[in-house]
Amino acid sequence: MAEHTFGFRTRALHAGGTPDAEHGARAVPIYQTTSFVFKDADDAANLFSLQKYGNIYSRLSNPTVAALEERIASLEGGIGAVATASGMAAEFITFAALCQQGDHIVASSQLYGGTVTQLDVSLRRFGIETTFVPGTDPADYKAALTENTKAIYTEIVANPSGEVADLEGLAEVAHEAGIPLVVDATLSTPYLIRPIEHGADIVIHSVTKFLGGHGTTLGGIVVESGRFNWGNGNFPSMTEPVPSYNGVSWWGNFGEFGFLTKLRSEQLRDFGPSLSPQSAFNLLQGVETLPQRMDAHLANAKQVVAWLVEDQRIAYVNYAGLEDHPHHERAKKLLPLGVGSVFSFGVKATEKASGRLVGGEFIGALQLASHLANIGDARTLVLHPGSTTHQQLTAEQLAAGGVGEDLIRISVGLEDIEDIIWDLDQALTYATGLNHAGERVGESSADKVVEAEEAVAAAKAAEDAAAAEAAAGASCSLPTTTQEEK
């Protein structure tokens, strides 16, 4: 048969899915089973000793989950993938497979707050240290390397600051040191960028977000390029015999598939963060329409950004698609279709209220956009990261992550653009008392909050003063005892 390379949209629909041989079902079936029947005793023994590939138990592999893994690996240009129960689980099994006690990771400080905590708290408790690098200069990452560093980790488009990583520069630094470049591509998806083409070795996604796209199902995935030399001496756990599998070597026996085999046969086996078949099916439905949804997300986001930039109530907009953004040229090169639809902005302070207070009033007044801790939904979502997703970080970590106290994150959805802008406009007017042009059209709800707090404070001060005065008067009127009375 003639060879043909299928396009992205075709693979989003078909990769990893073949008609069911037994019943002819065209959609990927849901294999809702814990385990799979062996042909005979030898078949079972060979599967358990990794002498053949097949399904044993759904904690390790499942046909529905495998379809999702193959589809996303195809879209990313990787050799394979391992799916997990969440994006955080995908990160954890990757770090756990790469590192052991005494090892080290160099990571961007511009990461999702949960990732920072996993690296800075949980992994540190296991004896794995992380150095966080502010900014995107590869030279700074190189300076942070130690002899025990096992990976460089970054998000392509940072959540929520919007910085764009220098992938090619970071890949050069990582490969010179003999370690992999691991990237989180959740915000961009393979539709906007395929990091492996720019030097990344391992790509992680929270499939919960744009790949799934509907805010219904959790999932994560790890995709491998198949290009990294795991036998370079820096990863003994990849080359030394594995006792639990009768001395096989991940690199020696499985070659380019060694790391993925380690993830599946060791990390999923021991830690168990497996994706359920039902969840895999749900996420597959989202992947099928990824290109069409991303086109619509981008179109809406660009119009929202343009509107916010012109709004006199807005202090700043962090969006690498803007020409004055410091990473605009890099974004144009790496993400020619666009940088996505998740970005951040700040609301100006009023005469009485801080930007943070005004932002809180703005979020509370939204009628269409949802205030919740997710991104990449079909619906428009907003959040104040400083008090939610990043609230566990120190002031220094927040500053290094580009998360100001007034910063608001928005994930622009698929609603009619007129409705999205109407909602933002009416909420800003409610919070500030100003219209789009900065003209006074009413009272500011944020100022009212400040005035109410001032009134309460004044009343409390008056009450305290009155109490103090009464106490002083009572003290003066107390009877005294004379010397004669004594």
Which residues does each PLM region occupy?
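N-terminal glycine-rich, Lys/His-bearing helix-loop that initiates the first secondary-structure elements
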Residues: 1-52, 436-486
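Conserved PLP-enzyme active-site core in the AAT-like
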Residues: 2-4, 9-21, 81-311, 318, ...
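Conserved N-terminal alpha-helix of the aminotransferase class I/II PLP-enzyme fold
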Residues: 35, 40-92, 114-121
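Short loop segments at secondary-structure junctions
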Residues: 35, 225-228, 347-352
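Short, solvent-exposed beta-strand edge segments and adjacent coil->beta transition regions
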Residues: 103, 338-342, 405-409
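PLP-dependent enzyme catalytic core of the Aspartate aminotransferase-like
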Residues: 120, 147, 349-353, 380-486
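Short hydrophobic/aromatic beta-strand micro-patches
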Residues: 223, 344-346, 411-413
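Conserved small-domain helix->loop->beta segment predominantly found in fold-type I
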Residues: 271-274, 279-280, 285, 289, ...
